[in-house]
């Protein structure tokens, strides 16, 4: 598992799973196609949590006379690796087709305006600069049978020293853990809906 390769030891973890009535290939394709912006629209609580977390950063930009970065019209999991750090960007730690994808982030998440560190995948596991937390989200598919798939989302966070551990624990116990759970559950639910949606019939040959 990519999770164990990059973060075998961690402070907190959360996991979500949902059963999808579709095969692994269809479910994986849906996971890669799901629009994260659309998840916020389909699941209002997910959208509200995202907007709430982004608010301090927006205010900070405005106070400095800067325009906040424009929100993308659409955003898929692989797109996160192309975004700048601090503007929604994540590090793609690894992807195994039709199996799992893992994304990582390093920062002081407990601050109203998060201080990020841009840490490449090959340095992610060893990163130990004091005062930071490292988070991984891993999403995976596992066959149940030929026509159904278990879709999973697992989050792990590790801190780099005692001070960061204390700060992160306070942040986590304020309800951030529940919020993270809701966000991933929303992503999995919309992925399931996409995977289970009937395939439109191919147009037949023209006649006449």
Question: What name fits each language-model region?
Answer:
Residues 1-90:
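Hydrophobic ligand-binding cavity/cleft-lining segments
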Residues 11-19, 100, 134-136, 148-152:
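Intrinsic-disorder/low-complexity, polar/charged segments enriched in Ser/Thr/Lys/Arg/Asp/Glu/Gln
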Residues 82-146:
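Hydrophobic-ligand binding "helix-grip"
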Residues 122-178:
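Beta-strand/loop substructures that line and gate deep hydrophobic ligand-binding cavities in soluble
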Residues 167-203:
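A conserved amphipathic terminal alpha-helix motif
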Residues 204-208:
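Acidic, Ser/Thr-rich low-complexity intrinsically disordered segments
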